Amino acid sequence: MDAEKIFKKMEVKIHAECLRLGERIPYIAENGTYSDMRDVKLSWWTNGFWPGILWQMYQCTGDSAYKTAAEHTEQEFDKILEHFEALHHDVGFLFLHTAVADYRLTGNPKSRTRGLHAANILAGRFNPAGNYIRAWNEDKTGWMIVDCLMNVPLLYWAGRELKDPRFEEIARRHTDTAVKYLQRPDGSCNHIAVFDPLTGEPLEFPAGQGYAEGSSWSRGQAWSVYGFALGYRHTGTKEYLEAAKRAAHYFIANVACTGFVSLLDFRAPEEPVCWDTSAAACAACGLLEIAQAVDENEKFLYQNSAERILEALEEKHCCWDTEKDGILQDGSVAYGKQVHVPLIYGDYFFLEGILRLLGKDFMIW
């Protein structure tokens, strides 16, 4: 695979999108055109991924157009910090890719303040009875989800920034609970665990965005591959690396049966065939993270599998037409919902994976 050649194609398309999108915040490209999530819900969980793409591009090209566009979205997010009741467990996705990325790359003190504000909101969702960060809002006080493993790096950053161990302690406890209750013995994972919010007793494991209870939603699996690996990066806790490896072995075994592109759910009926390329792209990044962490003699499995996934995505599922929004095609939001569409987070992880191979990535997590 020629990662440099793929990146050059990405650079051309992302530059065209940056000029075309202006101040819009993209999510799903329908008929080749991104809608603007500012008009739908500014606090929507995916709204940080386009700025994440922009900061990655700015870091590796130096083009100030990317920086300017990313800064605008970050400033827009001040509105959701002011009305924080609408925020949720995905503040990591929102602010790691905006304010924290800005601060890390430019030293902007206002960005630091925004990131710390978001980290305190995330920490405030922790339930000590069950040792988990509460997912969503409304009546879901006892819910935790695997996605949150990708948000807790915001807490690790805040803890280091403030030299305050409380943030890491919350992140560790949540991750410990995920190892215990979200990961299954075979390395697959539950999307959701529901606890009694007063006692912490586990109650049920609903289907979530997969096919059914007990099935295997591939993007949730990808969150676990990368999320546990990031837990190891930030803490050095071997248990997290072992959990990441178990999740990775399960993911690799499944995509090896389908040309190294992930089905939407690994335990769904054979028909209809539903893909989720965003899961594959995210998992590839997680596999590359694991490859950096393991001994040299273990590295090949994770590195090679990641490269085969990224190569398969480029060969089978990419649109390079600069007049159409979205690079990675055939992403799926959930089983039976918005299937086979370009998703902004799919493009983010695809870009991150390619940049990782080239040694040009900016560690946003």
Task: List each model region and its residues.
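Glycan-recognition and catalytic cores of secretory/periplasmic carbohydrate-active enzymes
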Residues: 1-365
